[in-house]
Amino acid sequence: MSLESVRAFLNAHAPDIEIIETAESSSTVALAAEAHGVEPAQIAKTICLRVGEQMMLVVAGGTARLDNRKFKDTFGAKARMLGAEEVVAITSHPVGGVCPFGLPSPLPIYCDISLKRFDEVVPAAGSTNSAVRIETGRLAELTGASWVDVCQ
């Protein structure tokens, strides 16, 4: 499903955004930055988390790290990263290709302010060798994300 679900989502909601597929893997921030000719911080990585029984996605700059204190202050509890099998189950995307587009079921999505220093960011597009270039504000708008400050 993954890449195709992202393609279907973009065709329906943002037909002007093109998926970029690369021959090489872009499954890590460093590989993605190299493949797309941007600095690592401009890669929009999607982190899959559980807070109690609630699952959520946080999209952050590629070099940003989740700050446990900020996260707890914002959400009232500590986050737990999901394992690879859980990630695929809730997003349909493999680790290294996770993005906030084309999800099988709605999830709360948050964009960290670490993305705001860029006009354009590069999130994955549902596979380990695909991505899109998207204006930062439009990423939040398309996914219905709320802005948070939970990274350092």
Predicted region positions:
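Extended, low-hydrophobicity, polar/charged segments
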Residues: M1-Q152
